[in-house]
């Protein structure tokens, strides 16, 4: 898979709200910075625990890719993440930076607009 295909598959997996599918493209040694006030998670087990926590309080997750750019193994996404999170609808516009090695994401950093900016 190309880096773009890996990232697209990862983002599509979120619609399932299935932690196994979401984690299928995450490397054992990956780092994940989900934005907002969340900490950086490091390593497969720590990231999986975070993902399980996120999907536990979601009843919907649709991710619209507005723009996507690839430079080598880095994929940049402009997105709108549309969620029902803790019973509340949320449209979260933002950017993501993904570093990909082979068919795994080794680093994922998200940057979202604050509510005051949207």
Residue ranges and their predicted role:
Residues 1-17:
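Short, aromatic-enriched amphipathic alpha-helices that serve as compact interaction elements
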Residues 2, 48-118:
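A beta-strand edge to alpha-helix "cap/lid" segment located at domain peripheries
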Residues 4, 20, 44-45:
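Residues in well-ordered alpha-helical elements
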Residues 7, 14, 26, 51, ...:
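Hydrophobic alpha-helical core bundles mediating ligand binding, dimerization, or RNAP-core interactions
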Residues 11, 36, 67-69:
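Structured beta->alpha junctions
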Residues 16-31:
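Short, well-ordered alpha-helical segments enriched in acidic and aromatic residues
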Residues 31-41, 55-56:
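A short gly/proline-enriched turn/hairpin at secondary-structure junctions
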Residues 39-49:
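Short beta-edge strand/loop motif at the mouth of beta-sheet-based domains
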């Amino acid at each position: 898979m190309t880096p773009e295909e890996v990232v697209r598959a990862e983002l599509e997996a979120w619609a399932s709200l299935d932690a196994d599918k979401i984690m299928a493209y995450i490397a054992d040694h990956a780092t994940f910075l989900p934005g907002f006030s969340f900490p950086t998670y490091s390593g497969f087990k720590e990231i999986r625990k975070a993902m399980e926590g996120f999907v536990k309080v979601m009843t919907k997750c649709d991710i619209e890719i507005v723009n996507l750019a690839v430079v080598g193994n880095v994929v940049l996404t402009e997105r709108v993440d549309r969620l029902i999170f803790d019973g509340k609808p949320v449209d979260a516009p933002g950017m993501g930076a993904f570093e990909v090695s082979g068919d795994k994401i080794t680093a994922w950093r998200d940057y979202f607009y604050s509510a005051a900016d949207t």
